Amino acid sequence: MAIPSNRDQLALSNGSHPEEYKIAALVFYSCIFLIGLLVNVTALWVFSCTTKKRTTVTIYMMNVALLDLVFILSLPFRMFYYAKGEWPFGDYFCHILGALVVFYPSLALWLLALISADRYMAIVQPKYAKELKNTGKAVLACVGVWIMTLTTTVPLLLLDEDPDKASSPATCLKISDIIHLKAVNVLNFTRLIFFFLIPLFIMIGCYVVIIHSLLRGQTSKLKPKVKEKSIRIIVTLLLQVLACFVPFHICFALLMLQGEENSYSPWGAFTTFLMNLSTCLDVVLYYIVSKQFQARVISVMLYRNYLRSVRRKSVRSGSLRSLSNMNSEML
């Protein structure tokens, strides 16, 4: 049985992540950063600048893209930490990034709940279709959930307790940096109720009523395209929530109950990866909702195909020229 060296014991006592995790995190977050930045910048530009007739869904999509961008811009700091193995940006900025890990899924779920309620209105209550064009109410709803989420996240920035304050090198961004604060357990479980269970039940309730209405044929007056689009949005939202957000919140609740002191949790790391992945999976939602976004994606794909064809032609023409030159020299 191998005896860990003093260096290994120091690393474990400092709560450092395993080397395999650091490498995986660097690769994963690099991909998420590049793809997510491209997707969400394009989406925000399309929804805010190129969409002529804005609807409530457009407003919600703008907020989703903005939230994704805010979260994505924090990834380079995490990547730097995993690459260097120490945190040089100070305790307060570490608290900000830790709070952002809690803030992002909380607000994202409420925005997805608003989109679900919007689709409920479009399918089950078509007589209120005019409300779907009332962007003012959608803006107020988004402002409300932003303020509500910020208000419950700010207390995490005001806590000074840190179990790794004396560590060398400085550490950050571990599960324990969030869950060790037993003084705010009441706040954490309240947040789980209001920012996970309630929006989740809203989404499930909307989906159940919509499916019930479709099965009973109560939506016969709707255009087939409207039904198809709404169903695709519903399926996309449901799959994204189940894959990215439900595992993260279940893990968070279990860690809070267990009071685990270890800074590294494989299950916590995996569910955090899934939660981060949602910033890229939103591209499916953008593509379904916006024709302008579809056109932009298609144009990029066509342009890439055009560039490939040009390169192939240039390579072929170059090879033909070289052959002709060789023949002329032989003659």
From Swiss-Prot:
Tissue localization of expression: Expressed in testis, spleen and brain (at protein level).
Keywords tagged on the record: Cell membrane, Cytoplasmic vesicle, Disulfide bond, G-protein coupled receptor, Glycoprotein, Membrane, Phosphoprotein, Receptor, Transducer, Transmembrane, Transmembrane helix
Disulfide bond positions: 94-172
Residue ranges crossing the lipid bilayer per the database entry: 27-47, 57-77, 96-116, 139-159, 192-212, 237-257, 269-289
Broad class of the protein's primary localization: membrane
Parts of the chain on the Cytoplasmic side: 48-56, 117-138, 213-236, 290-331
CDD domains referenced in this protein's UniProt entry, alphabetically: 7tmA_NAGly_R_GPR18
Modified positions (Phosphoserine) in chain numbering: 322
SUPFAM superfamilies named in the record: Family A G protein-coupled receptor-like
InterPro entries hit by this protein: GPCR_Rhodpsn, GPCR_Rhodpsn_7TM, GPR18
GO molecular function: G protein-coupled receptor activity
GO cellular component: cytoplasmic vesicle membrane; plasma membrane
Membrane topology: Multi-pass membrane protein
Localization per Swiss-Prot or TrEMBL: Cell membrane; Cytoplasmic vesicle membrane
Glycosylation sites: 14, 188
Extracellular membrane side: 1-26, 78-95, 160-191, 258-268
BP term (GO), one: negative regulation of leukocyte chemotaxis
UniProt-listed PANTHER family: G-PROTEIN COUPLED RECEPTOR (PTHR24232), N-ARACHIDONYL GLYCINE RECEPTOR (PTHR24232:SF1)
Role played: G protein-coupled receptor (GPCR) that plays a role in diverse physiological processes particularly within the immune and nervous systems. Becomes active when triggered by various endogenous ligands including endocannabinoid N-arachidonyl glycine (NAGly), delta-9-tetrahydrocannabinol or resolvin D2/RvD2 derived from the omega-3 fatty acid docosahexaenoic acid (DHA). Upon RvD2 binding, facilitates the resolution of inflammation, aiding in tissue repair and homeostasis.
Family to which the UniProt record says this protein belongs: Belongs to the G-protein coupled receptor 1 family.
Protein name: N-arachidonyl glycine receptor
Species assigned in the record: Rattus norvegicus
